[in-house]
Amino acid sequence: MNAMRASLTGELGRMTLTRGRLIGYEFDRMVMLFSMVDGQREIPCAISTSAMDDLENLARCQPNQREAQFIRLRDRIEERAARKFAALEFEGNPPGIVLRSIDFQT
């Protein structure tokens, strides 16, 4: 586990995770797909639409407004994705980061 953590973090414990691509809204799963980059490796990520709505205190955003909503919230979303990445909280196949409302509760 320590070797894996070492490969996922940079020198002095700094994460090497940087902004990746905005992939788009997946209606069937009700998630916005995006990626983060660790060196040369792209990390698949997703955030639930309910999490984005909760962040903005909205009842429900329309599907055609999801991309704009993600862009407004992108810094906060990516910060939480980086935290889950540092904690090695991967899900799915291929392993990636999935953000839900609970991930933003303090």
Regions found by a protein language model. Give the residues of each.
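Acidic, low-complexity intrinsically disordered segments
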Residues: 2-13, 58-106
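A short, structured beta-strand/loop element
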Residues: 33-58
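Short, charged/polar N-terminal "headpieces" of proteins
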Residues: 1-36, 41
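Short, exposed beta-strand "edge-strand" segments with a Pro/Gly-rich flavor and a Y/T-containing core
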Residues: 21, 39-47, 90-99
